[in-house]
Amino acid sequence: MSAIPAEESDQLLIRPLGAGQEVGRSCIILEFKGRKIMLDCGIHPGLEGMDALPYIDLIDPAEIDLLLISHFHLDHCGALPWFLQKTSFKGRTFMTHATKAIYRWLLSDYVKVSNISADDMLYTETDLEESMDKIETINFHEVKEVAGIKFWCYHAGHVLGAAMFMIEIAGVKLLYTGDFSRQEDRHLMAAEIPNIKPDILIIESTYGTHIHEKREEREARFCNTVHDIVNRGGRGLIPVFALGRAQELLLILDEYWQNHPELHDIPIYYASSLAKKCMAVYQTYVNAMNDKIRKQININNPFVFKHISNLKSMDHFDDIGPSVVMASPGMIQNGLSRELFESWCTDKRNGVIIAGYCVEGTLAKHIMSEPEEITTMSGQKLPLKMSVDYISFSAHTDYQQTSEFIRALKPPHVILVHGEQNEMARLKAALIREYEDNDEVHIEVHNPRNTEAVTLNFRGEKLAKVMGFLADKKPEQGQRVSGILVKRNFNYHILSPCDLSNYTDLAMSTVKQTQAIPYTGPFYLLYYQLQKLTGDVEELEIQEKPALKVFKSITVVQEPGMVVLEWLANPSNDMYADTVTTVILEVQSNPKIRKGAVQKVSKKLEMHVYSKRLEVMLQDIFGEDCVSVKDDSVLSVTVDGKTANINLETRAVECEEGSEDDESLREMVELAAQRLYEALTPVH
């Protein structure tokens, strides 16, 4: 049994190459109807070099039509420069404007602070720079189409520019949330709930069945913890990624310091090599934030802080007395946050606040279990005496937000990604429990491991739209409509051939047939024979040569020793041309037909020729407006209101009533008619 072509198959495959029962290196492959899409292309924060990549070796990058990046975090876009520059990928890549602006600086920082040899680096600063030219931008809610794949995006909350992508292939809709948050915070709007219900929902499961504490309570706990650390003369370290939650925490701290004058002498530093560039991006893209920020920008820019200074490196840091430092990266793997942590961890007055989600295998995750000692980057063992607090500002959905989002959309299939194995399993079980007694809503929940494919079947109806000329008139019941069926990507149209150039990129071609046939007989014999057969023969003159138009489509031109047929090739015209050819060959090859035909038509053809030429002659004498044909056997000449009629068969001329006394007109017409007849009559 022959395999079904991928484009005709009803099978849809979803395969995580990363973020399958793990957090990190998000990369989901979608295959349907011969199209392949990659959703995100991240790295694993807890791994290095090639080990941090998704399982790209399981696919052929050249087959990917479209790559969509949900947001700028490294676990969602960190492998993108490598994929665009080091593989055979030739498809198109899209992300939002804000994501592209921040991607450039965030990955530049990643390249600089990575603590691995140049040989193990996935890509260079040059690769990153060149990858920018291959990335296209999309506005929120803007519909685009690539290779028959329609897609658009919604606000996802989470971070500035984060997007959820709705993808439609052959009528099947899939929503990929990326990382999203349904809770509005100080600067970001909550994730939108699409008004279109998807058939498949690929959704993050980072927090599983956990419920977040209320925003107000969380902010108060955070501010109190920071206040306690500086009150005891300590230094507060808040490891964050340069962009994302950092801006939210800066807004909170700046407002808290403003309301507490006793803290004004204690400095807050935003320690990132990207600090200045990042804040410029945030100050630019305020229109992508929530209403509160957009209203405030009319008075002052909330991202121009009063109590926070930028700290580019440790060289510029005067580490004397209590202070608060927000430093990147967020999981304390390397960079400024790692330097400060190793410098401060032995003093019990100091404190570290973990404010975001931590991936397994990172130092941030390790210290949350409060070990007695830690290992420095140089391999030295240090006692951990500073306080460790975990206050999650991670803008991911909790169980309540996730379940409400699913309840609003009611997708038949839910695919869980971006969650640790146990958290994901608990979320899957909770969702199944929620809908097991609901007869109206049937939802299948899947939680595939990395490289494991989820296979779904979608059998869509094929509808063809009648367009253009064929759609001008409403068809009646039982009427047959015929045209050309045009398939473009996954859309079918029925068109008239004349509309092809209007509705498609197809060019219309015509084939002109020319056929020469030997013929030596009188040309008028062909006229007679074809007229007798078809009743549809028109006399023409082409380049001063006698010609006939038969069936309104076949042109017959007299040439010396032959006739030439011309027509536009199509099934009906070809059939007409065969008929005309048969008649010509029959007249040419059969002397009896020619002799009999001459006798039958000589008189008729003589009258025909005589009539035409007499009309021309009289027009030359009296003027074109004075001569008219009454019927096949009568010509009329009218001069100064007097009319003379000529009987072409008898050549008799009679004047109409009131014109009898004008003998001169009658005699003049009669003489002209007689002389022409004598000139045309052959001498035997």
Swiss-Prot record:
Give an example GO molecular function: RNA endonuclease activity
Cofactor(s) required, per the database record: Zn(2+)
Q: SUPFAM superfamilies given for it?
A: Metallo-hydrolase/oxidoreductase (SSF56281)
Binding residues for Zn(2+) 1, per the UniProt record? Answer: 71, 73, 158, 179
Q: Name one GO biological process term.
A: co-transcriptional mRNA 3'-end processing, cleavage and polyadenylation pathway
Q: Which Pfam families match?
A: Beta-Casp, CPSF73-100_C, Lactamase_B, RMMBL
Q: Which residues carry this modification: Phosphoserine?
A: 659
Q: How is it modified after translation?
A: Sumoylated on Lys-462, Lys-465 and Lys-545, preferentially by SUMO3.
Question: Where does this polypeptide localize?
Answer: Nucleus
State the coiled-coil residue ranges. Answer: none
Modified sites of kind N-acetylserine: 2
Q: For the cross-link Glycyl lysine isopeptide (Lys-Gly) (interchain with G-Cter in SUMO), what are the residue positions?
A: 462, 465, 545
Residue numbers binding Zn(2+) 2: 75-76, 179, 418
Q: Which GO terms describe its cellular component?
A: mRNA cleavage and polyadenylation specificity factor complex; ribonucleoprotein complex
- Keyword vocabulary terms for this entry: Acetylation, Endonuclease, Hydrolase, Isopeptide bond, Metal-binding, mRNA processing, Nuclease, Nucleus, Phosphoprotein, Ribonucleoprotein, RNA-binding, Ubl conjugation, Zinc
Q: Which family does it belong to?
A: Belongs to the metallo-beta-lactamase superfamily. RNA-metabolizing metallo-beta-lactamase-like family. CPSF3 subfamily.
This protein's assembly is summarised as:
Component of the cleavage and polyadenylation specificity factor (CPSF) complex, composed of CPSF1, CPSF2, CPSF3, CPSF4 and FIP1L1. Interacts with CPSF2, CSTF2 and SYMPK. Interacts with TUT1; the interaction is direct and mediates the recruitment of the CPSF complex on the 3'UTR of pre-mRNAs. Interacts with WDR33. Interacts with ZC3H3. Interacts with ISY1; this interaction is in an RNA independent manner. Interacts with the microprocessor complex subunits DGCR8 and DROSHA; this interaction is in an RNA dependent manner.
UniProt function note: Component of the cleavage and polyadenylation specificity factor (CPSF) complex that plays a key role in pre-mRNA 3'-end formation, recognizing the AAUAAA signal sequence and interacting with poly(A) polymerase and other factors to bring about cleavage and poly(A) addition. Has endonuclease activity, and functions as an mRNA 3'-end-processing endonuclease. Also involved in the histone 3'-end pre-mRNA processing.
PANTHER family attached to this UniProt entry? CLEAVAGE AND POLYADENYLATION SPECIFICITY FACTOR FAMILY MEMBER, CLEAVAGE AND POLYADENYLATION SPECIFICITY FACTOR SUBUNIT 3
Q: What is this protein called?
A: Cleavage and polyadenylation specificity factor subunit 3
